[in-house]
């Protein structure tokens, strides 16, 4: 880089301009070298010479809104005010012998369009600035320009707006045809000064004519040969001068008019409209980029106070900051609910996304920030009732309808003061909001699939099985400790076999009736053999004073059922003798009944009474065990495995009972031997008893 710069400095230019350029380059290189001793890239050196030309207005957010016109979307693309179009029009007029009025101002405007851009800074040729629209709405402005339908409107304040077209040709036509040049004293002065120029020019012509005459006279004196020719030439010159003097005032008039109008257009002066609107004086001019809405214009708008603010549901009057803030929070909450409850078709991609529809047809531009509408609050926050006192309501129905325009700009002005122009759109807007915020519940039921239904059924079955398997021992047994071993065994069989139901059997009678009918034989399974003490206690039963009797569910009912089914008259059945001894034991009761009265008259002896007292608790225990044993046999049918386990215990009890019976028989025989009258009968009884014992 240093070598290149040195080469640039050493180049010698021939012209002075080249020298100045080389000197400027060498000076800039020297400054760069002095400031930066190290090598510097070209881009960094050029940054120092870049000027920053940005205003603060450009940094502010664009708060302009567009209110579109449906009728302004068509463009012909033909410039009617162009020079070619005007010449074609004149040719047609001559062909049909029609004298067209030439409008030089249109030609001047068309030809001077580039000059307008140079003379007017930041001009927008496609837009016109319209002032004096104090009581006009958006539709009124569109109706005023119905011959030249605009594309959209940009409201600036209550009294002015920008009317925008899609091309600059239509805007210039509207400006020239709908407005006229402003009345000024300069126009009259120019008109009065131009006739005074005419006699001056005629005098000059006459003077020249007189001088010519003098010269001709001198020439005639010298030679009088060409008198006629000279006279003809003089006449022709005079005629030419007169014709020129007659044409000059017309040209000056035309140029003066065009020049005045040209000056007014170049100065961008407001031009009054040809026809007023409802008595309002309207003015038109070209719009510029500086014609923008100021911040806080909505808060200062008197139109909103008079006709209602569409940004806040069409409320009239002065709206407090707290009321505006609450309105914004409600609107935000409503939008959040709307996004949380989308339609089912939106998630599936069947329906297009929802767009706001209203008569103003706003373009989706960034909204004006809420901070512009709010000022610093005073101490404390006002109540809603206090804020409502300040607000003047149009009517109660408009309050319930909700906001007319959610994305409204400074003002939508839909139809002006007449509220009937946008009622249909507002009703459609509210209905669409309700449809979005509250989706139908019937559609949500259709989203369930067959796999979900199968899964729910499987879960219900699994839960029922878990409840059955997690049941306690009492639910499987079906009775308490005093309910008997038969109820316990049956309860286990039922709990292990039945899987379809989870009902708990609490009554032994139901089990016994099922066993009678034989319904449980198919579902029953062999009982599981348990260890020692628990099996003996379950089969032999518990004492009546056992503390576990309280826990039993229906012990009394089971005893009553056993007593009803089988009378407890037989002692041997209560003692629980083995089955092969039952026949011999049951065959003796009728003979015992015959001698029952004799034994009651004689009374027991001391030994017999002592043995009887000792046998009472054992007989009670054996009787209770016999009762439970009978229940076990009636309820469970055949239990071969249980009898094999208890055969040793039964043999021991049987041996003890036989010894006691033999002792009692011996005592009876010794007592009966002392009675001679009854010796034969006693001997028979004794023989029978010995045979039975053997």
UniProtKB/Swiss-Prot annotation:
Residues 477-496 have a biased composition (Gly residues). Residues 189-203 have a biased composition (Polar residues). Residues 15-36, 236-264, 387-404, 501-517, 563-595, 605-618 have a biased composition (Basic and acidic residues). The keyword Lyase does not apply. One of its GO terms (biological process) is mRNA transport. A motif (WLDD motif) lies at residues 155-158. It is found in: Nucleus; Cytoplasm. GO terms for cellular component: cytoplasm; nucleus. Its main location: nucleus. Keywords: Cytoplasm, mRNA capping, mRNA processing, mRNA transport, Nucleus, RNA-binding, Transport. Residues 1-47, 183-277, 336-430, 461-694 are annotated as: Disordered. GO terms for molecular function: mRNA binding; RNA 7-methylguanosine cap binding; RNA cap binding. Residues 126-187 are annotated as: RNA recognition motif (RRM) domain. Residues 685-694 have a biased composition (Low complexity). Associates with NCBP1/CBP80 to form an alternative cap-binding complex (CBC) which plays a key role in mRNA export. NCBP3 serves as adapter protein linking the capped RNAs (m7GpppG-capped RNA) to NCBP1/CBP80. Unlike the conventional CBC with NCBP2 which binds both small nuclear RNA (snRNA) and messenger (mRNA) and is involved in their export from the nucleus, the alternative CBC with NCBP3 does not bind snRNA and associates only with mRNA thereby playing a role in only mRNA export. This is Nuclear cap-binding protein subunit 3. The lineage of its organism: Eukaryota, Metazoa, Chordata, Craniata, Vertebrata.
């Amino acid at each position: 880089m240093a070598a290149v710069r040195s080469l640039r400095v050493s180049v010698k230019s021939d012209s002075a301009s080249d020298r100045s350029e080389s000197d400027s380059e060498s000076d800039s290189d020297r400054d760069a070298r002095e400031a930066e001793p190290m090598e510097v890239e070209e881009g960094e050196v050029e940054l120092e010479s870049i000027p920053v030309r940005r205003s603060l207005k450009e940094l502010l957010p664009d708060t302009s809104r567009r209110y579109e016109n449906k009728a302004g979307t068509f463009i012909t693309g033909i410039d009617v005010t162009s020079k070619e179009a005007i010449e074609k029009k004149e040719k047609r007029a001559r062909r049909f012998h029609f004298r067209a009025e030439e409008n030089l101002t249109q030609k001047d405007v068309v030809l001077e369009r580039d000059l307008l851009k140079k003379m007017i800074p930041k001009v927008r040729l496609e837009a016109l600035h319209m002032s004096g629209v104090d009581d006009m709405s958006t539709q009124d402005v569109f109706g005023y320009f119905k011959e030249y339908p605009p594309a959209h409107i940009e409201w600036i304040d209550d009294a002015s707006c920008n009317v925008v077209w899609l091309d600059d040709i239509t805007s210039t036509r509207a400006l020239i045809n709908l407005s006229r040049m402003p009345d000024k004293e300069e126009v009259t002065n120019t008109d009065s000064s131009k006739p005074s120029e005419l006699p001056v020019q005629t005098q000059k012509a006459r003077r020249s004519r007189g001088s010519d005459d003098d010269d001709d006279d001198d020439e005639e004196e010298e030679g009088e040969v060409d008198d006629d020719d000279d006279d003809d030439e003089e006449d022709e010159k005079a005629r030419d001068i007169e014709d020129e003097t007659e044409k000059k005032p017309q040209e000056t008039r035309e140029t003066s008019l065009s020049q005045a109008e040209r000056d007014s257009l170049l100065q961008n002066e407001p031009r009054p409209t040809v026809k007023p609107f409802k008595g309002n004086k309207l003015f038109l001019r070209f719009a510029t980029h500086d014609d923008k809405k100021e911040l806080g214009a909505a808060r200062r708008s008197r139109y909103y106070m008079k006709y209602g603010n569409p940004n806040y549901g069409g409320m009239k009057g002065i709206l407090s900051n707290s009321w505006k803030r609450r309105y914004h929070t409600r609107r935000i909450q409503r939008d959040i609910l709307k996004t949380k409850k989308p339609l089912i078709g939106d998630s599936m991609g069947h329906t297009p996304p929802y767009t706001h529809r209203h008569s103003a047809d706003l373009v989706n531009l960034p909204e004006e920030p809420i901070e512009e509408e709010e000022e610093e609050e005073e101490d404390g926050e006002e109540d809603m009732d206090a804020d409502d006192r300040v607000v003047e309501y149009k009517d109660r129905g408009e309050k319930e309808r909700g906001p007319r325009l959610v994305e409204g700009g400074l003002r939508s002005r839909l139809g002006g003061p007449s509220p009937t122009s946008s009622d249909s759109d507002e009703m459609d807007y509210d209905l669409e909001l309700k449809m979005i915020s509250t989706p139908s519940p019937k559609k949500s039921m259709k989203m369930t699939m067959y796999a979900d239904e199968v899964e729910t059924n499987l879960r219900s079955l699994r839960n029922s099985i878990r409840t059955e398997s997690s049941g306690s021992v009492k639910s499987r047994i079906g009775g308490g400790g005093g309910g008997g071993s038969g109820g316990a065994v049956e309860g286990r069989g039922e709990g292990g076999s039945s899987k379809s139901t989870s009902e708990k059997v609490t009554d032994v009678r139901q089990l016994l009736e099922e066993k009678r009918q034989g319904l449980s034989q198919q579902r029953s399974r062999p009982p599981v053999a348990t260890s020692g003490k628990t099996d003996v206690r379950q089969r032999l039963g518990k004492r009546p004073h056992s503390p576990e009797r309280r826990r039993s569910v229906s012990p009394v009912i089971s005893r009553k059922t056993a007593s009803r089914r089988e009378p407890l008259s037989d002692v041997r059945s209560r003692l629980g003798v083995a089955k092969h001894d039952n026949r011999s034991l049951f065959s003796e009761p009728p003979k015992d009944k015959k001698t029952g009265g004799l034994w009651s008259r004689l009374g027991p002896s001391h030994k017999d009474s002592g043995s009887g007292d000792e046998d009472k608790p054992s007989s009670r225990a054996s009787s209770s065990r016999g009762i439970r044993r009978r229940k076990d046999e009636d309820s469970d049918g055949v239990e071969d495995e249980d009898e094999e386990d208890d055969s040793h215990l039964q043999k021991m009890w049987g041996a003890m009972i036989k010894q006691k019976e033999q002792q009692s028989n011996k005592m009876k025989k010794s007592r009966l031997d002392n009675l001679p009258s009854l010796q034969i009968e006693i001997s028979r009884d004794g023989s029978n008893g010995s045979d039975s014992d053997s």
